[in-house]
Amino acid sequence: MTLKEIKGDLFSYPYTSSDIYVHCISSDFAMGAGIAKIFSNKFPAFVTRKAEMASDYAKRFSELRIYPVLMKNTRIVNLVTKERYWHKPTYGSLQVSLCSLAVYLSNRPDTKRILMPCIGCGLDRLEWDEVKKMIEETLHDFHGEVLVFYL
């Protein structure tokens, strides 16, 4: 796995069918601020399907701490790092989600790139150096690139 930090807008980078977007959300799927709000603006189905997705997550994915979706031919993996939108994630909750992401990726060899913001580091206030180390350790078996965007 190669991790590259890129200054620029996550959504300005060319997306291909072998890419996935990854970002953090709460299990209530509020998505009302930060990068989650930008995702919900770019993919309006997040808003219209919020109750359905939150219910589906609670029934099928809550142990995994991720919720993968396909919207407009775009693969998005939501890392569920906290229960409610006003909570803050911990390094432990992020680690659990990253481990689930690693399992998810091991079953999808067609994924060549992960496009993500500095997860957990905006409104959630985790330290990027620590998060970066967690990503590198947890996704070391991923045979592709992790592109992390910052402004």
Language-model-derived ranges and their functions:
Residues 1-151:
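Macrodomain-like recognition of ADP-ribose-binding/processing modules
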